[in-house]
Regions:
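Divalent metal-cofactor coordination and adjacent catalytic microenvironments
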Residues: 1-84
Length: 84
């Protein structure tokens, strides 16, 4: 992960157990790769919002597995993609 540190991720997701931490890291890596594949750059200017999106997407997937990404997160993804 380049957009967020493991410590930031664990705190945001309230991941306490080793199992939760491993899941959070795996999801965050997948989410980061998904954002990059959508053409969203990860650089000094986008890192704060990019990292927040990775954390929000990861928390949502941990709390609501299998559910669609909330509209608010999708809107922020589009905003970052087109206004970076």
């Amino acid at each position: 992960m380049e957009s967020v540190t493991p410590e930031e991720l664990f705190l945001y997701c309230k991941a306490d157990s080793e199992e939760q931490k491993l899941l959070a890291e795996q999801l965050a890596e997948s989410n980061e790769a998904a954002l990059l594949s959508k053409g969203i750059p990860l650089n000094q200017n986008t890192r704060p919002r990019f990292g927040l999106l990775v954390k929000a997407m990861t928390l949502h997937e941990m709390d609501h597995p299998g559910e669609a990404t909330p509209q608010g997160i999708r809107e922020k993804i589009n905003d970052l993609k087109f206004n970076h």
